[in-house]
Amino acid sequence: MATVALPDWTRAVVKVGSALVAPDDRGCSTTHLLPIARFVIQSRRQGKEVILVSSGAVAAGLAEQGRGGPGTGLSIPERQALAALGQPLLMAHWRRLFDVPCAQVLLTYDDLQRRARFVNAKNTIAELLDRDTLPIVNENDTVATEELRVGDNDNLAAYVAVLAEADLLVICSDVDGLYTADPHDDPDAERLPAVDAITDEIYDMVGPSHRKVATGGMQTKVEAAEKATDRGIDTVLVNGTKGGHLDALGRGEMPGTLFRQAEQPLPARKHWMLHALPSAGRLTVDAGAADALRHEGASLLPSGIVAVEGRFARGDAVEIAVEKEGNRTRVAKGITQYGAADLERIQGRQSHAIAEVLDEAPADYVVHRDDLVVEA
């Protein structure tokens, strides 16, 4: 197997999963955290900056109440209460491992999808780093609802890496890396030392999660890697239960899987549109419109739209797809200039007919190319 070196970096986000923070559902434990802390301390001594994204608040809350066991199947109020109980315990646990100030940063999905709040979070983390403080980030489960949750800290870590302008994302889990198949089921499965691009083939390799407390599985790790690499951030998946892997990482070696940054990273605004802004609906377009979006850098015109789905307003994000032989493929995502009701009236029509149908024409396009992110 080819040797892969860890790319040079100056600022990293290190994500630590529940399986490492609270192994065997016993609440917070240092069993797997000492090597991670050693990596963070060593990196800081080398003049590098590190941000931690730590799961484990709900698991800590369960253990504090003497319940332990799986954290699955909890209602939203139960999860919120247990997170409120466990988050201080989680922070205290981390503080014992470091001799530098640690700052708690709790984020919600709303903080990530609203651009102004995204920038506020970015500025807060930048200020903490300037003050030589170790930011420790978690999702604010105490106020998050099912509809407004990131849902897993793999993807949260990717969002944090983007807003913090990190150049490395390290996902510490209980797996050795990405395999060609589930190694528990397939003895011929091989670990991939590096992934150059995250394609449908890569997603096909991903198996389901079997974690008890954790909400993420291998799929969420690949999703997180895609978010990060799309913005030019190298991403590493390592086994945090094997202390030697973290020590190797500290030496610049690559014991897990490296997801290499995209050759052409997305600009900040388009990355936010694609990965953070929720889609409120979907527009299906004809093959000609799809080709124009993909290959000509065109705006989406009403003439190319064949179907409108969802209830959305002007300024909302919508997915744009093309259907061929019964299969629907996403082409792009963008911010629409027209709501769903108006689009149902003007779909398939030429731009000059918009005013005739609606009595007004705010724009002669539905999605401007500057507000459009085309899928690779």
UniProtKB/Swiss-Prot annotation:
The keyword Nucleotide-binding applies. SUPFAM superfamilies: Carbamate kinase-like, PUA domain-like. Residues 280-361 form the PUA domain. It holds the Pfam family AA_kinase. Keywords: Amino-acid biosynthesis, ATP-binding, Cytoplasm, Kinase, Nucleotide-binding, Proline biosynthesis, Transferase. GO terms for cellular component: cytosol. It comes from Salinibacter ruber (strain DSM 13855 / M31). This is Glutamate 5-kinase. Pathway: Amino-acid biosynthesis; L-proline biosynthesis; L-glutamate 5-semialdehyde from L-glutamate: step 1/2. Gene3D superfamilies: Acetylglutamate kinase-like, PUA domain. Substrate binds at S55, D141, N153. ATP binds at K15, S173, D174, T215, G216, G217, M218, Q219, T220, K221. InterPro entries: AceGlu_kinase-like_sf (IPR036393), Asp/Glu/Uridylate_kinase (IPR001048), G5K_ProB (IPR041739), Glu/AcGlu_kinase (IPR001057), Glu_5kinase (IPR011529), Glu_5kinase/COase_Synthase (IPR005715), PUA (IPR002478), PUA-like_sf (IPR015947). GO terms for molecular function: ATP binding; glutamate 5-kinase activity; RNA binding. Its EC number is 2.7.2.11. NCBIfam families: proB (TIGR01027). It catalyses: L-glutamate + ATP = L-glutamyl 5-phosphate + ADP. GO terms for biological process: L-proline biosynthetic process. Catalyzes the transfer of a phosphate group to glutamate to form L-glutamate 5-phosphate. Belongs to the glutamate 5-kinase family. It is found in: Cytoplasm.
